[in-house]
């Protein structure tokens, strides 16, 4: 038996999106986003409030990467979603992640995660918290 829910934005299950940036000091930062997805051929949309360290970095640097969490790294991915970069500046390293500089955008690739979408900031709406990135490249670990 099915239950109707009406017109809702349900596209579950969703991947856990890991948003990575560099701070002004060059340190990598990462958080997980509760909502996001592909919104056009070369566009990704993510809802992130402006009080996140990661959002601040994106607005200053104009770039970010989006990696997909995997089962092997779920604990680390959960950790960076719970701990604030404003309070714990070394959370990227404490999670056990290794940063590799993207040669396409000014943002880190998380070496441990298999898929990375490299993006340039296209727009950010403070009212709706909607961040839109232009997809510049997608890299996949072949191992």
In which residue ranges do the predicted regions lie?
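Active-site-proximal mixed secondary-structure blocks
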Residues: 1-31, 37-143
């Amino acid at each position: 038996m099915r239950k109707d829910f009406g017109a809702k934005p349900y596209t579950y299950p969703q991947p856990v999106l890991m948003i990575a940036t560099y701070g002004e000091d060059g340190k990598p930062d990462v958080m997980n986003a509760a909502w996001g997805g592909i919104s056009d051929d070369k566009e990704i949309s993510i809802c992130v409030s402006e009080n996140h360290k990661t959002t601040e970095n994106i607005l200053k640097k104009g770039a970010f990467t989006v990696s997909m969490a995997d089962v092997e790294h779920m604990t680390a991915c959960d950790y960076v979603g719970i701990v604030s970069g404003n309070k714990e500046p070394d959370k990227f390293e404490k999670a056990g992640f290794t940063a590799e500089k993207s040669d396409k955008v000014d943002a880190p690739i998380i070496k441990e995660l298999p898929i990375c979408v490299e993006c340039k900031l296209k727009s950010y709406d403070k009212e709706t918290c909607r961040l839109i990135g232009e997809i510049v490249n997608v890299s996949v670990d072949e191992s």
